Amino acid sequence: MRRLFDADVAVAEVDPREVDPEHVLLPVERDAVARAIDTRRLQYAAGRHCARSAMRTLAVPPGPVTQDDDRAPRFPPGLVGTITHTQWWCAAAVALESTRAALGVDVE
């Protein structure tokens, strides 16, 4: 996915099966998927893991990625981003809001 974006966009990818939601999710994120099935919880955790990894690449403090009422990811203030996944792959792209108005990728 890296090749889809310019250098000012940080990208991270992971196999959701390699992520432990209990160790990755922040409390506010954990609450959002407390009643979700395991597959959804894994994909949600993998997306947040990738998003925070991308934030670190941008040298910004990694924060929670909550969700809007339509389940779209809501990034911390000053950041824009996107999260996408399949059953076996998850990725996030994050940029500073000062350089991008929005980002979007959907693989399915």
What are these regions (language model features)?
Residues 1-108:
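Core catalytic alpha/beta fold that binds nucleotide/phospho-ligands
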